[in-house]
């Protein structure tokens, strides 16, 4: 179906930062927003929002499965002729261990969701992106994945997964440069979400210094999203391959 709207797909649009993105983008004129959830029927707040915003469509997606990603893309292709912006926001942060302490299953879970997940989704949605001229792909990343601004945080598997996805973003920015894509990674800040609440709870027990830091820098999802959208709304081809903080400053890889 042809549409003149600007079309967004938010992977992981059912809670936290992703849900705030859905709400902000769907409140704009001339937008269509697809929001994914692993179990859409359980995403009650997203479902309620979509009832009052007919430009929001929910899509079932398990990012750890290439088949699920392919099926999600096929579902979207039945509704629109292409997408402008793919925002790869799905992720987990359940690694509050040192490298020596982290169990193998924790490393595997973070790699499957935070690294292979975005790759699965991008590969599935690549044909839909090529149908539009915008061709913007946004990876929600983290400063924890920066080598150039490295800080020992105790987020071992999480930090490693974000470093890996930053590499993937950079590699894609070169591989598909001739196709006029714009890829970026963006750190949303330390955001007050259920995921970060778990981190605060953990550091209450293990690291008072980290707890103090997290409480000092934590922002609400709406602040993070409004700031990130200022970056994304103003992207230019020369920004391809960049790693940003939510406020638009550059993070070294």
Swiss-Prot record:
The keyword Kinase does not apply. GO terms for biological process: cellular detoxification of aldehyde. GO terms for cellular component: cytoplasm; cytosol; nucleus. NADP(+) binds at residues 17, 36, 62, 89, 123, 158, 162, 191, 193. It comes from Schizosaccharomyces pombe (strain 972 / ATCC 24843) (Fission yeast). It is an enzyme of class 1 (oxidoreductase). Keywords: Cytoplasm, NADP, Nucleus, Oxidoreductase. GO terms for molecular function: alcohol dehydrogenase (NAD+) activity; oxidoreductase activity. The active site is at residues 158, 162. It is found in: Cytoplasm; Nucleus. Belongs to the short-chain dehydrogenases/reductases (SDR) family. This is Uncharacterized oxidoreductase C663.09c. Its EC number is 1.-.-.-. The lineage of its organism: Eukaryota, Fungi, Dikarya, Ascomycota, Taphrinomycotina. The keyword Oxidoreductase applies. It comes from the Eukaryota.
């Amino acid at each position: 179906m042809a549409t003149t709207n600007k079309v967004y797909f938010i992977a992981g649009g059912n809670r936290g930062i992703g849900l705030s993105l859905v709400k902000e983008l769907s409140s704009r004129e001339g937008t269509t927003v697809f929001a994914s959830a692993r179990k859409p029927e359980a995403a009650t707040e997203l479902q309620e929002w979509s009832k009052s915003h007919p430009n929001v469509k929910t899509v079932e997606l398990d990012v750890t499965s290439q088949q699920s990603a392919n099926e999600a893309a096929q579902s979207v292709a039945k509704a629109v002729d292409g997408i402008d912006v793919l925002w790869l926001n799905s992720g987990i942060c359940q690694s509050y261990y040192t490298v020596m302490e982290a169990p193998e299953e924790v490393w595997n879970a973070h790699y499957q969701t935070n690294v292979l997940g975005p790759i699965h989704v991008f590969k599935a949605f690549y044909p839909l992106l090529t149908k539009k001229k915008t061709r913007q792909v946004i990876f929600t990343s983290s400063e924890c994945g920066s080598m150039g601004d490295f800080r020992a945080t105790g987020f071992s598997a999480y930090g490693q997964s974000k470093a890996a996805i930053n590499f993937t973003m950079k590699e894609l920015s070169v591989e598909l440069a001739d196709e006029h894509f714009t890829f970026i990674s963006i750190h949303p800040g330390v955001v007050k979400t259920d995921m970060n609440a778990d981190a605060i709870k953990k550091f209450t027990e293990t690291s008072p210094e980290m707890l103090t830091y997290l409480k000092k820098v934590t922002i609400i999802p709406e602040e993070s999203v409004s700031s990130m959208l200022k970056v994304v709304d103003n992207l230019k081809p020369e920004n391809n391959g960049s790693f940003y903080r939510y406020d638009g400053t550059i993070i070294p890889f």
